[in-house]
């Protein structure tokens, strides 16, 4: 499973592809046209795993510890 969404709690924690965890003050942006997801400066916001609105997966507990 590839997690591409940020936490919704404002913790600015985000998992990009390849288990790349964005730290505080960064957010994950979804790559397009085959580009990889990357961490950029900005407040973390939920990012969908698919193109369906409201289709989010929880961040695994082990990443939040």
From Swiss-Prot:
Cell compartment(s), UniProt: Secreted
SUPFAM superfamilies documented for this protein: Leech antihemostatic proteins
InterPro entries per record: Hirudin, Hirudin/antistatin, Prot_inh_hirudin
Spans annotated as Interaction with fibrinogen-binding exosite of thrombin: 55-65
Keyword Glycoprotein set for record: yes
Sequence ranges of Acidic residues compositional bias: 55-65
Keywords: Disulfide bond, Glycoprotein, Protease inhibitor, Secreted, Serine protease inhibitor, Sulfation
Residue numbers carrying Sulfotyrosine: 63
Glycosylation (residues): 45
Interaction with thrombin active site: annotated segments: 1-3
Start and end residues of each stretch annotated as Disordered: 32-65
Molecular function terms, GO-annotated: serine-type endopeptidase inhibitor activity
Disulfide bridge map: 6-14, 16-28, 22-39
A Pfam family hit: Hirudin
Gene Ontology cellular component terms for the protein in this record: extracellular region
Function statement: Hirudin is a potent thrombin-specific protease inhibitor. It forms a stable non-covalent complex with alpha-thrombin, thereby abolishing its ability to cleave fibrinogen.
Family affiliation: Belongs to the protease inhibitor I14 (hirudin) family.
Protein name: Hirudin-3A'
């Amino acid at each position: 499973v590839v997690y591409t969404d940020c936490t919704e709690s404002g913790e600015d924690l985000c998992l990009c592809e390849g288990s790349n965890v964005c730290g505080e003050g960064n957010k994950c942006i979804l790559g397009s046209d085959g580009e990889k997801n990357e961490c950029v400066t900005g407040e973390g916001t939920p990012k969908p795993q698919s193109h369906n609105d409201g289709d989010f997966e929880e961040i695994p507990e082990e990443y939040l510890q």
